[in-house]
A protein has these predicted regions:
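Residue-level signal for inorganic ion chemistry
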Residues: 15, 40, 51, 85, ...
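Short acidic/glycine-enriched loop/turn segments that link adjacent beta-strands
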Residues: 32, 122, 237-240
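N-terminal subdomain of lithium-sensitive/metallo-dependent phosphomonoesterases centered on the IMPase/IPPase/PAP
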Residues: 1-82, 259, 263-267
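Generic detector of well-ordered alpha-helical packing
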Residues: 41, 64, 81-84, 88, ...
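An extended, acidic
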Residues: 142-267
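Solvent-exposed alpha-helices and their adjacent loops that cap or buttress functional pockets
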Residues: 28, 69-71, 107-109, 127, ...
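DPxDG-like acidic metal-binding loop motif
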Residues: 71-135
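Short strand-turn-strand beta-turns centered on an Asx-Gly dipeptide
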Residues: 137-140
Length: 267
C-alpha cells in the first residue's frame, strides 16, 4: 500500500502543476471523444518508474502504454494515470489516479489484492486491501444502507462515439428504466471516483458499459471492502467491459435493469 500511495503522490504533484496550466498542454486524439495529453503521459511515466523501482518483478497494465513485463507475472499493477482526462482538459476538478494490485491465482485466474483511487485536487485518498477494509484517508468506509430505489442516487458513464452502437442502445434502455424510478442519476466523468463514491456512501450505486480494466479494477475492490457488491453485467466478480456496483440492498435490482439493457443490445 505504501508503494502505491507514494507513487500516486509523486505523480499527483506533476498532474496538479499541469492542471494549473492546462491550456498549454499538447493534446492528441486516440479516437472519437478519447483524448490523451502530455499530462497523462508524464503521470504514467512517473508511476511506471516508481512502481518498477519498488517492485521490479511485477507486471504492468497501463492505460496509455498497455501491458509490459513478463507474461508470467505473479503480481501485476493495473494503472490509470489520469482517470477523467476530459474533465482535466476542461479545467473541471474531478479526476483521479487509479492503481490496483492484481495477484495471479494457482488456477490461472486472478484477483485484486490492493487498490487506491486518489483525487489530488482535494487530497482524498480512497484505498483498500483485500480482507482489511476500505478507507478514505484514515476513515473506514461503508456503503450506504439505503433500501428504497426511489430514494437512491446513482452514477453512470455515458457511452459516446468511441463505444459501440449496441452499448449506446443498452445504456439508453437502462437509463430510461432508472430515471423515473430513482432520486436521480449523475454523470461526473471518472469511473474510478464513481466507484470510490459508492464505497463512501455518496452514491448508492453505479453502472457503466464499454469500460476498461484500468478504469475500474481499483474501484471495484474498494466497493467490495466497503461492504458493497461490484460485479460484471452477469453478476460475476470479473473485471469486464460492464460494471455494476451498489450496496447489497440495491445491487440485485440495478443488475436486473442493466441485464435488460444488455438484452436490447443483443436483440
Amino acid at each position: 500500500m505504501t508503494v502505491m500511495q507514494n507513487a500516486a503522490n509523486k505523480a499527483a504533484k506533476r498532474l496538479l502543476r499541469d492542471f494549473m496550466e492546462v491550456e498549454n498542454l499538447q493534446v492528441s486524439v486516440k479516437g472519437p471523444g478519447d483524448f490523451v495529453s502530455q499530462a497523462d503521459m508524464r503521470a504514467e511515466a512517473t508511476l511506471r518508474e516508481e512502481l518498477e523501482k519498488a517492485r521490479p518483478g511485477y507486471g504492468l497494465l497501463m492505460e496509455e502504454s498497455g501491458a509490459s513485463g513478463s507474461d508470467k507475472w505473479a503480481w501485476r499493477w493495473i494503472v490509470d494515470p489520469l482517470d477523467g482526462t476530459t474533465n482535466f482538459l476542461h479545467g473541471i476538478p474531478h479526476w483521479a489516479i487509479s492503481i490496483a494490485l492484481e495477484k495471479r491465482l494457482p488456477d490461472g485466474g486472478s484477483e485484486i489484492n490492493a487498490a487506491i483511487v486518489y483525487c489530488p485536487v482535494n487530497g482524498e485518498m480512497f484505498w483498500a486491501e483485500k480482507g482489511v477494509g476500505a478507507y478514505l484517508n484514515d476513515r473506514r468506509l461503508r456503503v450506504s444502507a439505503r433500501r428504497d430505489f426511489k430514494e437512491a442516487l446513482f452514477a453512470t458513464g455515458i457511452p459516446f462515439a468511441a463505444t459501440s452502437a449496441g452499448n449506446r442502445l443498452a445504456f439508453a434502455r437502462t437509463l430510461g428504466a432508472l430515471m423515473p424510478a430513482t432520486a436521480g442519476v449523475r454523470r461526473f466523468g471518472s469511473a474510478a471516483l464513481d466507484l470510490a463514491w459508492v464505497a463512501a456512501g455518496r452514491y448508492d450505486g453505479y453502472w457503466e458499459m464499454g469500460i476498461k480494466p484500468w478504469d475500474i479494477a481499483a474501484g471495484m475492490l474498494i466497493v467490495r471492502e466497503a461492504g458493497g457488491y461490484a460485479t460484471d453485467g452477469e453478476g460475476k466478480d470479473n473485471i469486464d467491459s460492464v460494471v455494476v456496483a451498489a450496496n447489497p440492498h440495491l445491487h440485485p435490482k440495478l443488475l436486473e435493469l442493466v441485464r435488460d439493457g444488455l438484452a436490447a443490445k443483443q436483440g
